[in-house]
Amino acid sequence: MKKNILNLALVGALSTSFLMAKPAHNANNATHNTKKTTDSSAGVLATVDGRPITKSDFDMIKQRNPNFDFDKLKEKEKEALIDQAIRTALVENEAKTEKLDSTPEFKAMMEAVKKQALVEFWAKKQAEEVKKVQIPEKEMQDFYNANKDQLFVKQEAHARHILVKTEDEAKRIISEIDKQPKAKKEAKFIELANRDTIDPNSKNAQNGGDLGKFQKNQMAPDFSKAAFALTPGDYTKTPVKTEFGYHIIYLISKDSPVTYTYEQAKPTIKGMLQEKLFQERMNQRIEELRKHAKIVINK
């Protein structure tokens, strides 16, 4: 349910899900073929059959996350990243030994990757040009005034929910809660959530459907609208439908809304307007290219 903002997985940029598998942890995990040294001269962090692994091997991560800095990582994080690079190099060497890089399938895959990389590189260059554009102060101020209530008000709610497949199931659960005295409604809600919810996170945790705290934009629109309309200690008397199914929502608490000032919101506004300008320029440029290209669509 909740749209968690996740940190970039450091090793994610280096390998496929196969390579991401954790190595077995045992006393012999560092085999006799693996030597640890303190020699990191010339930026060489490790070698695999003579091939050096350097900080530049992690440039792909920096492209995705500009804040990435290998030198600022904790020692265990560095070791994990280096180990992942070693695992990748080992498999790469094995693939070359098997001459997989000479197969038609691999060559076709590389062509597809090159095409996609070229498109992304072109788009990156366009984005860099857009960042140089100064967004007028008045345009940012007007955007803030027009969108203040929707985008720049922070308010968190803490709620529970029960998710079921059908509206009839949801109505039955609401009816069961309705029968309870006020002092016992939340306890009944927790009991029914643990028993009936199809939300896998809640079901596995057996936490009474506790979603923790969330903001409006972190939930499906209809869910947020219903949740934030409640008062603490109250629950939805009619099922709330979303793409996930039907919800019954119980509100535990709700913070008072806090509106960001223009100055606080300004960096976000600038980014949003730059993104809008980028999309407009991309569409405009592509239309120009379309006009000058010979395009044939076969039906």
Swiss-Prot record:
Residues 1-21 form the signal peptide. Its EC number is 5.2.1.8. GO terms for molecular function: peptidyl-prolyl cis-trans isomerase activity. InterPro entries: PPIase_dom_sf, PPIase_PpiC, PPIase_PpiC_CS, PrsA_foldase, Trigger_fact/SurA_dom_sf. It catalyses: [protein]-peptidylproline (omega=180) = [protein]-peptidylproline (omega=0). Keywords: Isomerase, Rotamase, Signal. Residues 154-253 form the PpiC domain. PANTHER family: PEPTIDYL-PROLYL CIS-TRANS ISOMERASE HP_0175-RELATED, PEPTIDYLPROLYL ISOMERASE. This is Putative peptidyl-prolyl cis-trans isomerase HP_0175. It comes from Helicobacter pylori (strain ATCC 700392 / 26695). The lineage of its organism: Bacteria, Pseudomonadati, Campylobacterota, Epsilonproteobacteria, Campylobacterales.
